[in-house]
Amino acid sequence: MLSILVCHSYYLRRDQKQVLRAKPYPPLATLQVVSLLRKAGHRVAFFDAMLADGREEYDRLLQADRPQVVLFYEDNFNFLSKMCLDTMRRAACDMIASARNAGARVISAGPDVTDAPGPYLNAGADLALIGEGLSALLEVLPRLDSNPQASSADLARGLAGVASLGGAEALAGGVSKASALIPDAGLAAWDLVDMDGYRAVWLKAHGYFSLNMAASRGCPFRCTWCAKPIWGNQYLQRNATEVAQEMAFLKRSFKPDHIWFADDIFGFRVDWVAEFAASVRAADAGIPFSIQTRADLVSERMAEALREAGCREAWIGAESGSQRVLDAMNKGTTVAEVQVARDRLKAAGIRVGFFIQLGYMGEELDDILATRALLEAARPDEIGVSVSYPLPGTKFYDLVKAQLGGKTHWRESDDLDMMFHGTYTSDFYRSVRNLMHDQVALQSGGAPPASDEHRRVQHALDRRWQDLLSQELNYRSRPARAALAG
């Protein structure tokens, strides 16, 4: 059996927005892989970059343990990993080089690796796993164990979803599908997590402690902009009773005050959610939790089942208040469904957050104002606002690929640069984002609507909107200006 150092490259301290947000979670997918490798009999160490100040502990582990293999397995459940940030790619490539210098064989896996294995292989990785990569990983490791000096090409030979360097090219043997291995691996390796460190960050910033879980993998819907490098359009759902039992374990072992379900879509089927609610009660596993879902899945029965299971907050991909934009995104939902979902969840006592996306192809000022109107009418408790971000493997990326310049990835999560020829410049969308955040903050947590203070703040906010809109022509991008001139 092999000695393996498992790690990831998301350093919270390199992403200023997330430092201020102060909501770090242990790398769930990485910890699941640790559990899988332990079950296979390997000796496994773990480096968690999330709370690390720098690479010192990683370098210490390399020197002290002298692992035969260093596996970079990014947290596929973390939306920050899915964003493929340039800062984290640089961190990973530096860590790969150090591992090679320490004499280890290196395997790399994750969303960015799947999209662009070349940079990781050129940094020194022997192999890049394309997609989830678990089945391929469990075939590669015995080859390494029996022949530690095997070439990268020999290690990858005949395996789907494994890339290696052929000359200067990254060569991949097909694409692997998501495996059924993770549910069989048992619990994630929670014993290796610095729980005191995570708890301290949460308590200091928010006064409560949250941990993460996942009840499913993947999403079957086909929004044009949604990158799915790991699971594609598959949706693999765990047994509801097993999820409740895991929640009970976390409750007994670490006493979190809250659970974040990192699923792209939690529950999906109302019968599953109802079974989960019953299992939570039976196991005395109840912990308030937050989820992500879709507006068209929130029936009255679904809202009630979520309430019974302990859901306290649901995030909906509203995206836009313009039906024209939603249709262009192939979102498959309507503005009316978003409003109805908000109302049903509110009636069930569940807070609602909206994900809003600005700047999609063809979005005009009227569409942005329709989104503003949706926020005023639906009154979500919270919002997250981003701009359209073209990532490889999406229809959206294919449509705007020719417009991309030298910058193909955001540097960190608050970047919000427009990397294609949208209607407006990045500064305009950042201003709209700020106004929308302030509007929702006023609606959900400000002074009473009838008070003088509320009217004063609303008047100031309306004035800021007017000032921005009066200058909107100046914020139009060059292609948009050219179209107007034509």
Predicted ranges, named:
Residues 12-16, 80, 115-118, 221, ...:
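Flexible glycine/acidic-rich beta-alpha junction loops that bind and position SAM and/or redox cofactors
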Residues 25, 188-355, 373:
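Radical SAM [4Fe-4S] cluster-binding motif and immediate context
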Residues 117-122, 302, 362-377:
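Catalytic cores of alpha/beta
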Residues 49-52, 265, 294, 321-330, ...:
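Conserved strand-turn element in the central/C-terminal portion of the radical SAM core barrel
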Residues 2-6, 59-62, 68-72, 145, ...:
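Radical SAM enzyme core and accessory elements
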Residues 85-94, 274-275, 331-337, 367-369:
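Charged helix-capping and loop-helix junction motifs
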Residues 2-248, 252-253:
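Acidic, low-complexity intrinsically disordered segments
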